Structure formats: C-alpha cells, structure tokens
Curated annotation (Swiss-Prot):
GO terms for molecular function: S-adenosyl-L-methionine binding; tRNA (cytidine(32)/guanosine(34)-2'-O)-methyltransferase activity; tRNA (guanine) methyltransferase activity; tRNA 2'-O-methyltransferase activity; tRNA methyltransferase activity. It catalyses: cytidine(32)/guanosine(34) in tRNA + 2 S-adenosyl-L-methionine = 2'-O-methylcytidine(32)/2'-O-methylguanosine(34) in tRNA + 2 S-adenosyl-L-homocysteine + 2 H(+). This is tRNA (cytidine(32)/guanosine(34)-2'-O)-methyltransferase. S-adenosyl-L-methionine binds at G53, W55, D75, D91, D116. The gene is FTSJ1. One of its GO terms (biological process) is wobble position ribose methylation. Interacts with WDR6; the interaction is direct, and required for 2'-O-methylation of position 34 in substrate tRNAs. Keywords: Cytoplasm, Disease variant, Intellectual disability, Methyltransferase, Nucleus, Phosphoprotein, S-adenosyl-L-methionine, Transferase, tRNA processing. It comes from the Eukaryota. Changing A26P: In XLID9; severely decreases methylation of guanosine in tRNA(Phe) and cytidine in tRNA(Trp); methylation of cytidine in tRNA(Phe) appears normal. HAMAP family: RNA_methyltr_E, RNA_methyltr_E_TRM7.
C-alpha cells in the first residue's frame, strides 16, 4: 500500500496535512463552530483528551489569536508543544487536574470545554458505547469544576441504543443539548457530538471529583437528581452537500485545486501506545496466539468430547485479518 492510498481514501486526512492540522478531526470542530458559533465571546477554553492536538490547534488560532485568549490542553499522553496552548499531562478524573486548569486561568472559570476523546474500540458495540459514555461523564464532571455559568460543553458520543439516557444526564446541567454530526465525520460511524450550551447546574449541586460519575455506587448524589431518565434531542448535520464526503474516495488532483504533491503528517504522535506493536509488525515478529481455552464455550462444547491435547495456533503478521491493526512503514 503506497503513501498516496490513504490520501485517495480519506480526503479530510489529506486536507488536514495540506493545511497544517495535526489530524483530520480539526475539520469536525471547525464545522461545529460554523453551525453553532462556539467561539463567539470565548476567551478561555479547555481541550480535554487533547492529543495529538488538532482541536487545540483550532482553539489556539480562533481564540488565542485574539491576543487575550487562553487555551489549556489536557491529556494523559505527551503532546508536542503548540504556540499559545498550555499543556497539562494529567488525568481528567483527578481533582488536581481541575485545580491546575483554574490556576492557569488565574482563578477564572472557562467559557468553553471540549472533549474529542474516545477509548480504543473493541468491535463489541455495547462495550464501546458504554466506555465512551463513561469517558464523557468523566469529562462532564471536570467541566462542572472549571466551566462558568452559561458556558458551553462539546464532547464526542457514540449513538447507541442507550444514548437517550446520556442526553438526559447532560440536560440536568445545560439548558440546551443537541446531537450534531459534522460533514467530516464518516456516515458509516456512530460517532457524533453532544453540543451542550447554557451551563446551569441544579441548585445546591457541589462538584466532587472523588465521585467521578462512572457508576451509581460512586456517585449516589448525581444519580438521585430529579428529571426524566431518557429524552430525545434534536439532531443537527453540520455542513451542506458542497462539502467533501468523508466516506468517498477522491482523485489525487482535486477539481479546482493545484497539482497533487504528497504531504507528510504535520506532527507524528509522541510515544503512542501502539508504537511497540508497529515496530514488531515491521520486523515480522508480531504474532497472535489462539488457544482453545481462550475461546468461548458453545452449546456443542457442553457435550462429552474425546480428550485431546491442547493446541496453540499462531497467526504470523502476513496471515492477519484485514481488520487487524495496520501500521504504515
């Protein structure tokens, strides 16, 4: 697979490199802002789960470029420096992280909190949706510590069967909750974004990061709040048909554009968690072991079977399925 193949398959990936963005997700925030004017009047913004930093880039240009704007980026992983962005390598479920954010804002709360984080997907949709919901609630919890009344919160969601419960939890804290799908987000993906405006916590609510909103046993106060348990919110598409289709392949020479020239990524990730696996695959040393005892027991397996010695099947890297991880050389 050549270097240009992904440029053909993913036009937003290609445009991100050509425009100096660290990732294609920058277009998602730009399209959300075009629809909802997220940056209007914003001088202090927080980017949670910020690495590799494309949303922080957008915030820096839209807010920090005004001279009086301040942007704080938070992530567990290291991130290459960005001009006009204060970086915190920390855990969003820790109170110390919230205090450090406020400290950088000189005691003032933030106008906008965004979160484009997502867990490593497993392919089990129920598990992925649950993990994403818990990550969003953790982001919401830290937002309640740093967001000013009337502020805005934008976070990635997976539109599963239980997303209506998530909407009801968000509406407890915000006067307006919408589900938005940017044009640069693939139609084949269940990804969308919760756009929550008008932060207005319940009377008497005291944020507490010792209870990270991850389960009813952790935070009984949050789960005892009154209100509907499931609601339906408006669904908004960001961008019209004149925008590029994120699910379509495009020729290298785009209509009305200059002659194609390959552009390397703007900023490769720093010490990504998959780095070791990529190194092993390049050397042909990546293997996947499948043992009978690791497989789920089917109904047929419950009947008596002749005893046989356990076997270990090894699939070398060239034999891996198409949906396994692929790393460019």
């Amino acid at each position: 697979m050549g270097r240009t193949s992904k440029d053909k398959r993913d036009v937003y990936y290609r445009l991100a490199k050509e425009n100096g963005w660290r990732a294609r997700s920058a277009f998602k925030l730009l399209q959300l802002d075009k629809e909802f004017q997220l940056f209007q009047g914003v001088t202090r913004a927080v980017d949670l789960c910020a690495a590799p930093g494309s949303w922080s880039q957008v915030l820096s240009q839209k807010i920090g470029g005004q001279g009086s704007g301040h942007v704080v980026a938070v992530d567990l992983q290291a991130m290459a420096p960005l001009p006009g962005v204060v970086q915190i390598q920390g855990d969003i479920t820790q109170l110390s992280t919230a205090k450090e954010i406020i400290q950088h804002f000189k005691g003032c709360p933030a106008d906008l909190v965004v979160c484009d984080g997502a867990p490593d997907v497993t392919g089990l949709h129920d598990v992925d949706e649950y993990m994403q919901a818990q990550l969003l609630l953790a982001a919401l919890n830290i937002a309640t510590h740093v967001l000013k009344p009337g502020g805005c919160f934008v976070a990635k969601i997976f539109r599963g069967r239980d997303v209506t419960l998530l909407y009801s939890q968000l509406q407890v804290f915000f006067s307006s909750v919408l589900c938005a799908k940017p044009r640069s987000s693939r139609n084949s993906s269940i990804e969308a974004f919760a756009v929550c405006q008008g932060y207005d916590p319940p009377e008497g609510f005291i944020p507490d990061l010792s209870k990270p909103l991850l389960d009813h046993s952790y935070d009984p106060d949050f789960n005892q709040l009154d209100g509907p348990t499931r609601i339906i919110v408006p669904f908004v598409t960001c961008g019209d048909l004149s925008s590029y289709d994120s699910d379509r392949s495009y020729p290298l020479d785009l209509e009305g554009g200059s002659e194609y020239k390959y552009t390397p990524p703007t900023q490769p990730p720093i010490s990504p968690p998959y780095q070791e696996a990529c190194t092993l695959k390049r050397k042909g040393q990546l293997a996947k072991e499948i043992r009978p005892q690791d497989c789920p027991i089917s109904r047929v397996d419950t009947f008596p079977q002749p005893l046989a010695a356990p076997q270990c099947h090894t699939l070398l890297a060239p034999e891996m399925e198409d949906n396994e991880m692929s790393c460019s050389p």
